[in-house]
């Protein structure tokens, strides 16, 4: 058989069919479809056609550009099978789709082809597979039989995928041009190969430590529930249950508002009953509410995270155990678009590392010791200092704050605002206005009602009819409104920035981050969030730029070291203990802090290397 000269084409589409999804375990590719710009497609069963396998092994990595939907999966699966693609030359239509519109409900190839190109994949194949193997004619049931199907049937299915991905990529080229998304797309494209490498190499774990930590969580959970029962005077099931309603005994006041026993107003469910969900519990001052939330968090950490995500996905490689997290650059194709973020932040699944709270020292101290650097190396940890608040200051451009940072780049944003407004930096008691909480409200567009709730100040709940549904909204009392107006008066530029962003969002339908990412407001909804989403989106963009700079420095200057992970505003690296680690950490610090395009300085410090993730977060700083 004659194989195509793929080096002559500016781009091709490649898609593999596999025995399953777990490339990091035993699943492998069994077939590959290649689509050319000429419109020709060919499917190769590489189990039977070993000439095709060896040709791909020798030639696919030479392709100028390879495009596909969720091509990261193909890279991993083909590599596990013995065929290497060059991630630097690969482009993912799923990542591009989320840049073009971050609000879609689905990002799978079939949904995008129907939406943009009026094309449809061959879903009849599931009926054909059901006729051969039995069972329901659905993708979920039949996709597991694909590797057993006749070659011509698989070829029909696979070739439609590569053709569809190629044509979607072509359409996206024009749309990226039309929307002027080149800058942010180049950032995502540059980042892609580093994400692939971080996933491929994974993170080393200690399974024995994981089991010990799960047992410790059993003990702490039991103590928490015992204290809850003591305060309640009866046994309370911390999961949603009738005992929680009995505990908080909600009643309607004269205005018809449901209130808990501590006086906290409660929103209503669709049926008009009082809602005692997590948000209601977070609003309460009742200590039992905090114990319920703590017990739930401990159970989730133990059962879902440690036993499910970590131990459930750990694999042994030689004498070590690893997890290989799935890192979502934007939105995923899982069907509901729930993985990844519209503002550009990374998210992790399998395990969901971002769910380990960075500020909850109790949970962090239990979970983070499970994660280890590469064998023979140590773990160093860097955390950006008030990153989103500094970006908030850059955009709002308040004269006093800009001048304060110019005099001392290490100043605390919350203390600066406290000095300007006369409020304490942090709350010293419930119901006390404080600079930190108001800054959080401004960055995350809480609204005055939610801000009042967070600070423990008076608020009411009003039902608002949106036409298709009725929604309960928190309405701040006069005390909170006065505090917010005082904030606007003393921290000048914030109110004007919010007004300007909202106006642009309403008139244009989107706002742009520093790197050109579009944050859209379909039908003009939620434009009051525009300024905060600019801050968060810009932070996400700069975070991705930092990942690229850190990974490329380590790759160039000390390739035996590597970037392990990035969650929240943290960067973790694995380093040789060779006497040069402090030099490398200071270089990384300089790369992250060099942001001349911002009006305010960016600050990060890296820890002295330590044996595990938790100890690195507790170690002295190496870059001060």
Swiss-Prot record:
| Name of the featured protein | DNA polymerase DpoZ
User: What SUPFAM superfamilies does UniProt report for this protein, alphabetically?
Assistant: DNA/RNA polymerases, Ribonuclease H-like
UniProt-listed InterPro entries: 3'-5'_exonuclease_dom (IPR002562), DNA-dir_DNA_pol_A_palm_dom (IPR001098), DNA/RNA_pol_sf (IPR043502), DNA_polymerase_A (IPR002298), RNaseH-like_sf (IPR012337), RNaseH_sf (IPR036397)
Q: Which organism is it from?
A: Acinetobacter phage SH-Ab 15497
Q: Name one GO molecular function term.
A: DNA binding
Keyword Transferase: yes or no? yes
Q: From the UniProt record, give one GO term of the biological process aspect.
A: viral DNA genome replication
UniProt similarity note: Belongs to the DNA polymerase type-A family. DpoZ subfamily.
Instruction: Please name one Pfam family that this protein belongs to.
Output: DNA_pol_A_exo1
Its encoding gene is what?
dpoZ
Q: Which Gene3D superfamilies match?
A: 3.30.70.370, 5' to 3' exonuclease, C-terminal subdomain, Ribonuclease H-like superfamily/Ribonuclease H, Taq DNA Polymerase, Chain T, domain 4
Keywords associated with the record: DNA replication, DNA-directed DNA polymerase, Nucleotidyltransferase, Transferase, Viral DNA replication
Q: What does this protein do?
A: DNA polymerase that preferentially incorporates the non-canonical base aminoadenine/dZTP instead of adenine into the synthesized DNA. 29 times as efficient in using dZTP instead of dATP as a substrate. In addition to this preference for dZTP, the phage also encodes a dATP triphosphohydrolase that removes dATP and its precursor dADP from the nucleotide pool of the host.
Query: What is catalysed by this protein?
Result: DNA(n) + a 2'-deoxyribonucleoside 5'-triphosphate = DNA(n+1) + diphosphate; dZTP + DNA(n) = DNA(n)-Z + diphosphate
Transferase in keyword set: yes
């Amino acid at each position: 058989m004659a194989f195509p000269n793929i080096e002559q084409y500016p781009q091709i589409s490649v898609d593999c069919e596999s025995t399953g999804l777990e490339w990091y375990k035993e699943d492998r590719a069994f077939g590959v479809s290649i689509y050319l710009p000429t419109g020709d497609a060919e499917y190769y069963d590489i189990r039977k056609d070993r000439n095709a396998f060896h040709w791909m092994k020798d030639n696919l990595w030479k392709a100028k550009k390879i495009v596909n939907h969720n091509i990261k999966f193909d890279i991993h699966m083909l590599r596990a099978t013995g065929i290497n693609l060059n991630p630097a030359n690969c482009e993912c239509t799923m990542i591009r789709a989320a840049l073009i519109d971050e609000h879609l409900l689905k990002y799978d190839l079939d949904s995008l082809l129907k939406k943009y190109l009026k094309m449809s994949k061959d879903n009849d194949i599931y009926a054909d597979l059901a006729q051969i193997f039995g069972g329901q004619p659905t993708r979920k049931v039949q996709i597991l039989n694909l590797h057993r199907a006749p070659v011509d049937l698989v070829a029909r299915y696979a070739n439609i995928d590569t053709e569809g991905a190629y044509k979607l990529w072509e359409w996206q080229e024009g749309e990226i041009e039309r929307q002027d998304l080149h800058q942010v797309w180049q950032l995502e494209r540059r980042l892609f190969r580093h994400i692939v490498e971080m996933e491929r190499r994974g993170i080393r774990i200690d399974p024995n430590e994981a089991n010990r930590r799960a047992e410790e969580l059993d003990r702490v959970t039991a103590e928490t529930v015992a204290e809850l029962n003591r305060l309640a005077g009866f046994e309370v099931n911390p999961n949603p249950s009738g005992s929680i309603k009995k505990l908080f005994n909600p009643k309607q006041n004269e205005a018809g508002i449901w209130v808990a026993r501590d006086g906290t107003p409660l929103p209503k469910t669709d049926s008009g009953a009082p809602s005692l969900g997590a948000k209601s519990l977070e609003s309460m001052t009742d200590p039992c509410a905090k114990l319920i939330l703590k017990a739930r968090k401990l159970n989730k950490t133990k059962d879902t995270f440690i036993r499910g995500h970590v131990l459930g996905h750990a694999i042994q490689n030689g004498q070590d155990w690893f997890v290989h997290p799935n890192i979502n650059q934007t939105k995923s194709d899982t069907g509901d678009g729930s993985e990844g973020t519209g503002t550009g932040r990374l998210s992790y699944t399998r395990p969901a590392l971002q769910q380990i709270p960075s500020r909850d020292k109790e949970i962090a101290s239990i979970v983070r010791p499970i994660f280890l650097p590469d064998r023979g190396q140590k773990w160093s940890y860097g955390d950006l200092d008030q990153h989103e608040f500094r970006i908030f200051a850059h955009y709002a451009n308040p004269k006093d704050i800009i001048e304060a940072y110019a005099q001392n780049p290490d100043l605390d944003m919350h203390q600066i605002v406290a000095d300007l407004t006369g409020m304490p930096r942090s709350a010293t008691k419930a119901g006390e206005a404080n600079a930190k909480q108001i800054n959080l409200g401004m960055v995350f567009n809480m609204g005055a009602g939610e801000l009042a709730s967070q600070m423990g100040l008076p608020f009411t709940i009003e039902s608002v009819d949106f036409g298709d549904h009725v929604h309960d909204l928190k309405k701040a009392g006069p005390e909170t409104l006065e505090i917010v107006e005082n904030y606007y008066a003393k921290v000048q530029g914030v109110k004007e920035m919010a007004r300007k962003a909202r106006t642009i969002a309403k008139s244009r339908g989107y706002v742009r981050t520093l790197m050109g990412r579009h944050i859209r407001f379909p039908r003009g909804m939620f434009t009051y969030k525009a300024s905060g989403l600019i801050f968060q989106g810009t932070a996400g963009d700069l975070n991705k730029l930092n990942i690229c700079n850190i990974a490329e420095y380590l790759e160039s200057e000390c390739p035996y070291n590597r970037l392990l992970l990035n969650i929240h505003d943290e960067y973790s690296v694995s380093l040789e203990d060779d006497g040069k680690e402090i030099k490398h950490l200071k270089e990384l610090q300089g790369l992250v802090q060099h942001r001349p395009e911002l009006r305010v300085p960016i600050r990060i410090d890296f820890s002295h290397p330590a044996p595990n993730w938790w100890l690195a977060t507790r170690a002295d700083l190496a870059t001060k």
